[in-house]
């Protein structure tokens, strides 16, 4: 499964969707192309697996993705196609979340599984990279744009770090 994730992660940099500027994070702006490829692939793998690993509790992964993708829809609202895609995914996630959390009562419980959580992780990673590529926010965030994008995915990523350190 991890090998397939690596191939999927390589797809974005090969389509020139990669991080090429850290927007002043740690005082670094422009980075070499090879570093952008590596950073992009690592970021995608971390985000995809972070979303996948938090899918064990009913409503957690879908609820966080609703919040994350709604924020990216606002952040990327100048690009109407991206904002519409986010809105459509959020709309379907709200319905999924309802049946995932409250479906036990009526016997209509559904679950996401690996395919759903990996897809959501990839979408979140794509939106994160897209938001870091250039100033496309409704209000130009400048150097804060990197921190906004990182903050949106902080909970799932820190959970992965916590689990990795706990299992040592």
Regions found by a protein language model. Give the residues of each.
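Intramembrane alpha-helical segments
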Residues: 1-81, 91-103
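Alpha-helical transmembrane segments
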Residues: 61-168
């Amino acid at each position: 499964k991890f090998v397939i994730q690596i191939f999927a992660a390589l797809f974005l940099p090969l389509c020139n969707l990669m991080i090429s500027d850290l927007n002043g994070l740690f005082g670094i702006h422009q980075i070499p192309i090879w570093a952008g490829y590596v950073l992009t692939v690592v970021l995608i793998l971390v985000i995809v697996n972070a979303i996948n690993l938090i899918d064990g509790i009913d409503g957690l992964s879908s609820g966080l993705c609703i919040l994350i993708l709604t924020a990216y829809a606002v952040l990327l609202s100048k690009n109407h196609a991206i904002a519409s895609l986010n809105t459509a995914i959020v709309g379907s996630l709200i319905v999924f979340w309802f049946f995932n959390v409250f479906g036990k009562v009526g016997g209509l419980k559904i679950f996401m599984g690996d395919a759903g959580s990996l897809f959501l992780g990839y979408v979140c990673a794509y939106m994160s990279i897209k938001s870091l590529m250039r100033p496309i926010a409704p209000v130009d965030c400048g150097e804060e744009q990197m921190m906004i994008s990182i903050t949106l995915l902080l909970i799932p990523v820190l959970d992965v770090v916590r689990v990795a350190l706990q299992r040592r």
